[in-house]
């Protein structure tokens, strides 16, 4: 067996999920490679997809919200979407790439390559390519129903949402959003590296891979609480430089990091954008969680899923963020309940369970 993992650089979660799957496959001695889908078609294609995504995040995500709503509307119409037609254009080159490199199974963590693979399998002049589509959020996205993989990998209890989109129940594998076993078991405390004592409260603020969100209005009030604050800025250099101007010993500013598990493990409370993968990472390490600054659309659904299952608290305003962090700090029982719900609902063995399934069904 030789596995190709395909993602797209539209938000960090899709790529992180792909890397977790690669890591788990490698641990099981399965030959595999991970590549950005658009890298197969050249730098221009990749840059175009990334630029379009970044532009939709403008105006505090309002453009993305409108695009997402339009997508939901078109998806309900059951007509062939422009998204499918666009990705269909890449089928010949993707097919040739897969055949040339002798891949026997493809795993996708993004809609785009899933639609291209579906177009390949719908064309009788090509050999069938078995593939799995990993849903990295807590709601099926628009046009997901146009993909036709062997299986959709998704979160348990969301079966009805997928079925309502016209996806067959027989294609659902509810092992959960994959987070590698090493991410969880290798997480370690890094408090001593940042001169944080064991008795100090630490708030971790995660703003996504691109550092999305204005946090000035919450940083100042939180610094008055005499607690340590760690902010992960991702690739947002402007935010990184701006926060470093505070020159406050209680504020630790981090750019892009590959050991986010250590920062989650070392914190007492986490404030995070409600990305599907990042929320799963936090819940897998079991931390009280506030969801902040959702990108309207799919992240709204992630917030609802976590909130409805009492795994996080949704904060819509700066005041709610400040009030709720104080609420958690003064209510240990609420934090314990949140953590218990995370343990009950989120599968810590999601990646290893997926690999076991692959070995049983595709080896």
What are these regions (language model features)?
Residues 327, 334-348:
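A short, well-ordered alpha-helix in the C-terminal region of glycosyltransferases
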Residues 347-363:
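C-terminal alpha-helical cap of glycosyltransferases
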Residues 124-184:
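Active-site-proximal region of nucleotide-activated glycan assembly enzymes
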Residues 196-266:
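Donor-nucleotide binding loops and adjacent catalytic segments primarily
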Residues 308-334:
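C-terminal "capping" alpha-helix adjacent to the active site of nucleotide-linked donor transferases
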Residues 20-95:
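Conserved N-terminal ligand/cofactor-binding loop architecture of enzyme catalytic domains
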Residues 265-275:
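Acidic donor-binding loop of glycosyltransferase active sites
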Residues 184-196:
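A short helix/loop element that forms part of the nucleotide-sugar donor recognition site in Leloir-type
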